């Protein structure tokens, strides 16, 4: 406990008072390279605390976080979505959805294109062809 007390009461104030913080706006332009390097650690701490606070308290940051769920709307009442398609019923080829965005489940309708554009993903359909 004594080391924490020493750090808070003595070391931290001494460190902060030794930082080369200028008194005027023009003083920032007169700082040397060594002075700028000395300002990096406290700046990184302040930016880190600000970022963590933003992530914890800002509703917009929390809204963007993903739940990890890939199926947002297809047959949600079922415990597991399974489709059996007889290969004999496929004409020459069929494209099946892998992104869960289609309105024509289980067939692909190209909905992944907008998803890929918005998220930078590269998902596409599974294409089955008959020989």
UniProtKB/Swiss-Prot annotation:
It comes from Drosophila mojavensis. The keyword Iron-sulfur applies. Binds 1 [2Fe-2S] cluster. GO terms for cellular component: endoplasmic reticulum membrane; mitochondrial outer membrane. Its cofactor is [2Fe-2S] cluster. Residues 1-35 are lumenal. It is a single-pass membrane protein. Pfam families: MitoNEET_N, zf-CDGSH. InterPro entries: CISD1/2, FeS-contain_CDGSH-typ, FeS-contain_mitoNEET_N, MitoNEET_CISD. This is CDGSH iron-sulfur domain-containing protein 2 homolog. Keywords: 2Fe-2S, Endoplasmic reticulum, Iron, Iron-sulfur, Membrane, Metal-binding, Transmembrane, Transmembrane helix. One of its GO terms (biological process) is regulation of autophagy. Belongs to the CISD protein family. CISD2 subfamily. It is found in: Endoplasmic reticulum membrane.
